[in-house]
Amino acid sequence: MRETVSTNITGARAAAGWLYLVAAATALNSLTVFNYGRFVDLIVGLSFTQLIDAVFVGMALEPRGAPWLWTAGPALMFDIPIVLLLLVLAVKVSRRRKRVAQFSFWLYAVDTFVFLLMFAANVTSHARLRILVLPGLTIVGHTVGLFILYRASRHARCTCALA
């Protein structure tokens, strides 16, 4: 019995740590795009924010010479709530909330599926192997995250409320 409780707490801490890592990587991905003008995939960041950033980077091409805040500001308005959502989910998962852990798992599963679709598009377009390495590592990293979140959702306490 004591070993099971210890495993549950460790799984919840691991899942919360993973969500904190995803939130940090997502924020760094977004800031890197707008500060340096290029995408740097930190393997565990969310695809949702990368797609949002890509739209606003594309919009930054016209007019030329637009200030940084003019292009990055709207994208960060979308990215910041997503990062805050990840932080709230991490806190709730650390308290071993079953439904929140399940929601986190499914949210990350959808994100992994989006990365799989992007990877499949690269493969079908006959991209060079060097270009496929980083998306492949991203899928591996997301699979590890899914495993951690799945374990936390299985061993979390069952609560009636979503909060």
Where are these regions (language model features)?
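Topology signature of small-to-medium multi-pass alpha-helical membrane proteins
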Residues: 1-163
